[in-house]
């Protein structure tokens, strides 16, 4: 009988990416892989799109809020139903372990696995834990973290960032689409790539639309999340979504303007790519991106600009400063020890699963 592992995590692409890195490795080693998530969530979309041999199990999910809302009452019942569904799934499958990447949907499967005596491994990408992982930590066997946590927690293993970016651009797949884009760009201009993510692209889209003069100063690549904005014209490439083209576009850019999500930040760090961080504020998030951005700026990896300060004047000043000190930023990023390979983490996780099973 093949070994089985359950994955969970969703709500944003960031809560799925690491799972999609690990899953093929388990499949290659003969494991049967199952995924618990929201059928209407990004996790189901990404699993379907991946084409991986994964069985998806849908559960009810409710949002966990730190503030009062009448929706909390309805969501209590959704979470309770999700827990019952998760208990049934875990009891039926009897997996060797569960791995969670976080997000609201992950809490019921984590609790269910713990109640049924299954080892639970969770991962936290941000400088501080979100509410879902604060709850999940209580039920976890081990928590792996990208950042060193300020609180000394007994079940935490500081891992660093796990990323599969190509450090050698020659390894990247060739793209005829990329060649077509280059024909519209000027070799005399720096190329900027704007990455807003699923929650933060709108501000960048509006900034570029409001300031057409940017196209006279730079070649602009704008990942918009909105197919209505798709455009390829002189010095401008706007595209709603990219997959295989993502890393080639990052490599093509002289500088990346990004939000403060940890996955993208550490991909840029792994590539030693010059970048400006415009983090989501507390009005649009729990403040984790502000913490991530400050962490990167203090270590000399990047410069940050707060969203309310994103004016053309401030943007131009930030660009000038980054390009003037480009060599210093790149040297600091190249010297980092905060990046781990997927193989390293997979081997560590496999070893920890084996140890947890033996200790039962």
UniProtKB/Swiss-Prot annotation:
Family: Belongs to the glycosyltransferase 28 family. MurG subfamily.
Pathway: Cell wall biogenesis; peptidoglycan biosynthesis
Gene: murG
Any one Gene Ontology molecular-function term assigned to this protein's record: undecaprenyldiphospho-muramoylpentapeptide beta-N-acetylglucosaminyltransferase activity
Record protein name field: UDP-N-acetylglucosamine--N-acetylmuramyl-(pentapeptide) pyrophosphoryl-undecaprenol N-acetylglucosamine transferase
Function: Cell wall formation. Catalyzes the transfer of a GlcNAc subunit on undecaprenyl-pyrophosphoryl-MurNAc-pentapeptide (lipid intermediate I) to form undecaprenyl-pyrophosphoryl-MurNAc-(pentapeptide)GlcNAc (lipid intermediate II).
Subcellular compartments: Cell membrane
Disulfide bonds: none
Entries under InterPro entries matching the protein: GlcNAc_MurG, Glyco_trans_28_C, GlycoTrans_28_N
């Amino acid at each position: 009988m093949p070994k089985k592992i359950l994955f969970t995590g969703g709500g944003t692409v960031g809560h799925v990416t690491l799972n999609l890195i690990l899953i093929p490795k388990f499949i290659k080693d003969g494991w049967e892989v199952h995924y618990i998530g929201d059928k209407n969530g990004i996790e189901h979309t990404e699993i379907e799109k991946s084409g991986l041999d994964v069985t998806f199990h849908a559960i009810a999910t409710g949002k966990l809020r730190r503030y009062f809302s009448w929706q909390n009452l309805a969501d209590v019942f959704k979470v309770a139903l999700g827990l019952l569904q998760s208990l049934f799934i875990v009891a039926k499958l009897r997996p060797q372990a569960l791995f969670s990447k976080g997000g609201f949907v992950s809490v019921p499967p984590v609790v269910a696995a713990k109640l049924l005596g299954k080892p639970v491994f969770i991962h936290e990408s941000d400088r501080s834990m979100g509410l879902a992982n604060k709850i999940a930590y209580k039920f976890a066997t081990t928590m792996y973290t990208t950042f060193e946590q300020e609180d000394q927690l007994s079940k935490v293993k500081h891992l660093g960032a796990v990323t599969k970016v190509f450090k050698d651009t020659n390894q990247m797949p060739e793209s005829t689409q990329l060649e077509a884009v280059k024909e519209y760009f000027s070799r005399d201009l720096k190329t900027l790539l704007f990455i807003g993510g699923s929650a933060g692209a709108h501000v960048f889209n509006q900034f570029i639309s409001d300031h057409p003069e940017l196209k006279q100063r730079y070649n602009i690549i704008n990942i918009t999340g909105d197919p209505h904005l798709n455009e390829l014209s002189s010095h401008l490439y706007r595209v709603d979504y990219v997959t295989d083209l993502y890393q080639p576009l990052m490599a093509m850019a002289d500088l990346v303007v990004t939000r403060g999500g940890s996955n993208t930040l550490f991909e840029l760090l792994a590539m030693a790519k010059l970048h400006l961080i415009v983090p989501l504020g507390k009005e649009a998030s729990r403040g984790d991106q502000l913490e991530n951005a400050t962490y990167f700026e203090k270590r000399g990896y990047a410069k940050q600009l707060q969203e309310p300060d994103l004016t053309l004047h401030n943007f131009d000043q930030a660009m000038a400063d980054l390009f003037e000190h480009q060599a210093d930023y790149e040297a600091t990023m190249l010297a980092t020890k905060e990046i781990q390979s997927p193989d390293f983490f997979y081997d560590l996780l496999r070893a920890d699963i084996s140890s947890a099973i033996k200790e039962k």
